[in-house]
């Protein structure tokens, strides 16, 4: 399964692509989409959408995982972040992909095993899990973490579903 993780932002949107083969996680690519703050906001959203659409077309992921907004003290920033998330989600949906959302707490829990882990701990664990030569750019690293979170979530859902089916089959025999 190939997963595109996205860390949306109105100035910088990180992306990370991870393949899960059995129990192995394999790094495919990562990077950041930078928008020009001198341009109007709709043009910046168009850049995010267009760049992610190109990435989806190039790498053909099976699923998209996006970091969810937790909170923001600045209403204007939260609205812009929400719109950037919307552009990312639409890029995935428009390509016919399922889009999954995870909170920062869920991502940290999946990657480090501690929902309150420091950013440096998460970055270091990503480097180890994906056998990267160095820590990825901050936004790209966050996106890789979201992709890893989804990879782990799919495994857990599969195991849970199999266990439920096994219990049901025994109960009705």
From Swiss-Prot:
InterPro entries: RNaseH-like_sf, RNaseH_sf, X-over_junc_endoDNase_Mg_BS, X-over_junc_endoDNase_RuvC. It catalyses: Endonucleolytic cleavage at a junction such as a reciprocal single-stranded crossover between two homologous DNA duplexes (Holliday junction). GO terms for biological process: DNA recombination; DNA repair. PROSITE patterns: RUVC. It is found in: Cytoplasm. The keyword RNA-binding does not apply. SUPFAM superfamilies: Ribonuclease H-like. Mg(2+) 2 binds at residue 67. GO terms for cellular component: cytoplasm; Holliday junction resolvase complex. Its EC number is 3.1.21.10. Mg(2+) 1 binds at residues 7, 139. The keyword Membrane does not apply. It comes from the Bacteria. GO terms for molecular function: crossover junction DNA endonuclease activity; DNA binding; magnesium ion binding. It is an enzyme of class 3 (hydrolase). Binds 2 Mg(2+) ion per subunit. Its main location: cytoplasm. Its cofactor is Mg(2+). The active site is at 7, 67, 139. Belongs to the RuvC family. The RuvA-RuvB-RuvC complex processes Holliday junction (HJ) DNA during genetic recombination and DNA repair. Endonuclease that resolves HJ intermediates. Cleaves cruciform DNA by making single-stranded nicks across the HJ at symmetrical positions within the homologous arms, yielding a 5'-phosphate and a 3'-hydroxyl group; requires a central core of homology in the junction. The consensus cleavage sequence is 5'-(A/T)TT(C/G)-3'. Cleavage occurs on the 3'-side of the TT dinucleotide at the point of strand exchange. Homodimer which binds Holliday junction (HJ) DNA. The HJ becomes 2-fold symmetrical on binding to RuvC with unstacked arms; it has a different conformation from HJ DNA in complex with RuvA. In the full resolvosome a probable DNA-RuvA(4)-RuvB(12)-RuvC(2) complex forms which resolves the HJ. This is Crossover junction endodeoxyribonuclease RuvC.
């Amino acid at each position: 399964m190939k997963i595109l993780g996205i860390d949306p932002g109105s100035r910088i949107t990180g992306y990370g692509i991870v393949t899960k083969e059995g129990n192995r996680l394999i790094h495919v690519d990562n990077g950041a989409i930078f928008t020009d703050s001198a341009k109007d906001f709709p043009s910046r959203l168009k850049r995010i959408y267009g760049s992610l659409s190109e990435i989806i077309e190039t790498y053909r992921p099976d699923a998209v995982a996006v970091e969810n907004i937790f909170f923001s003290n600045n209403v204007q920033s939260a609205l812009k972040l929400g719109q950037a998330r919307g552009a990312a989600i639409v890029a995935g949906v428009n390509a016919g992909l399922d889009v999954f959302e995870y909170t920062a707490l869920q991502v940290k829990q999946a990657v480090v095993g501690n929902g309150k882990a420091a950013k440096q701990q998460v970055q270091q664990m990503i480097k180890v899990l994906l056998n990267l030569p160095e820590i990825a750019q901050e936004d790209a690293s966050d996106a890789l973490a979201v992709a890893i979170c989804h990879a782990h979530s799919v495994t857990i859902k599969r195991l849970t579903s199999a266990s439920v089916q096994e219990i049901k089959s025994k109960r009705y025999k």
